[in-house]
Amino acid sequence: MPAGLGALFEPSADPLADVQRAIAAAGLTERRALVVLGANWCHDSRALAARLQQSPLADVVEQHYELVLVDVGFLERGRAVAQELGAANYYATPTVFIVDPASGQIVDDEDRHLWGNAYRVSMSESVAYFEKWAARHLAPDPTAGSPQLGQLYARIDAFEAQQADRVAAGYAVVGPMLAAYKAGNEPEEFEASWNELRDFRMAIPGDIRALRDE
């Protein structure tokens, strides 16, 4: 995609406050908050950011969502926002969190990770996705009335938290390499480290869903 197109992610002094304001504004207008974690170095992030500004998707977003873009830098930021919203971490750039302002619940838990390949998602697919989650009712708590299932889900959450910590540790290693690579000084071990971390983090959402579906 053309250089600079969709480069809309800007560092913020207080991204948590930005997200909280978006959720509050969404509640006042009976919409949902659309929180996008991404970065300008990431072509998938720029692709989604650009598409969000273009009709017909821009019209859907304006009608149904309060949008906030969160810059994750070179992977050193963003986890605090994900955790504030109830997620263990973000596993891709971009990551899309659609939040119901009344409950604070993330509503697109089942398929939000597809945006890690946002460049390949068409405009029509994008419109269908955001129209779907604008209208979808909140899912009932699957553990309600079942202490045994609640305990199982708690163990799965603890497992994901461990995996999310491993991803955060990987970001701390790979992030500076990524910054050097983007500056034209690629470290010798960057490609292997990046690919290893990418494969690990991108597998986590599917693994967690498989555990919950067993």
Feature names for model-found ranges:
Residues 1-11:
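Post-cleavage N-terminal segment of exported redox proteins
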Residues 9-16, 37-39, 50, 54-79:
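Thiol-based oxidoreductase modules, predominantly thioredoxin-like and allied folds used
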Residues 13-33:
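A short beta-strand-turn-helix
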Residues 27-29, 59-62, 87-92, 101:
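Extracellular/periplasmic catalytic domains that process cell-envelope and extracellular macromolecules
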Residues 28-42, 96:
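Short active-site neighborhood of thiol/selenol oxidoreductases, capturing the structured segment around
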Residues 45-49, 79, 107-111:
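Short, solvent-exposed loop/turn and secondary-structure capping segments
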Residues 90-147:
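Non-catalytic, surface beta->alpha helical segment in thiol-disulfide oxidoreductase systems
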Residues 151-214:
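Oxidative protein folding and maturation machinery
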